[in-house]
């Protein structure tokens, strides 16, 4: 509980992590499941939209927590005690925020390839325009199944969208994060980056 209070008191988008921030992230990775789940919940926004189901934010601080948690799962507890190892793990993603969105398709869809969904960022005002950002699409397929003529197929059931944005572009402000299809807004939510580590 004290760890969560310390995180809440120091919570703001950290543009450049120092040794104390790294140690705090590593301590969180060693914390109880309930504390880690509570931490991660701030970064995952579940939407009521039937198509765009979730938007997730991964800051540099959270990325280190995720990396350290993976090391702990593999039994490598020493990673969570080494500032140097953490700095090396973050070297290629310094100052980068990853934004993800998950799009679910109707089970009756006939897509051979995923439609051109994209992530977009804008001002928090409801009617403010969103600016598209370079987005990587990763198709999600169903479990393979056999057809009556003995072919093995799988259907396209969704897509995950990913983008990397410089923390300096986002800043410590509230931003609208949206998903567009052919330039038209499909879903939108706001994220207060000043409240994230």
What are these regions (language model features)?
Residues 1-4:
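Positively charged n-region of N-terminal signal peptides that target proteins for export
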Residues 6-14:
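Bacterial N-terminal signal peptides
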Residues 17-197:
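Conserved functional micro-motifs across diverse proteins
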């Amino acid at each position: 509980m004290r760890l969560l209070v310390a995180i809440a008191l120091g919570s703001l988008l950290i543009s450049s992590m120092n040794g104390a921030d790294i140690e705090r992230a590593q301590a969180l990775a060693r914390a109880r499941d309930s504390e880690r789940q509570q931490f991660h919940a701030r970064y995952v926004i579940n939407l009521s939209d039937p198509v765009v189901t979730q938007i997730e934010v991964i800051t540099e601080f959270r990325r280190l927590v995720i990396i350290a948690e993976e090391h702990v799962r593999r039994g490598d507890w020493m990673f969570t005690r080494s500032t140097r190892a953490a700095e090396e793990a973050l070297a290629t993603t310094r100052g980068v925020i990853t934004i993800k969105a998950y799009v679910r398709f109707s089970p009756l869809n006939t897509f051979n390839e995923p439609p051109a969904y994209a992530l977009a960022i804008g001002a928090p005002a409801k009617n403010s325009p969103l600016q598209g950002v370079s987005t990587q699409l990763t198709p999600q397929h169903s479990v393979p199944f056999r057809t009556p003529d003995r072919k093995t197929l799988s259907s396209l059931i969704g897509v995950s969208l990913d983008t990397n944005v410089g923390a300096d572009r986002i800043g410590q402000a509230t931003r609208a994060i949206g998903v567009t299809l052919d330039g038209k807004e499909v879903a939108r939510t706001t994220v207060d980056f000043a409240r994230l580590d």
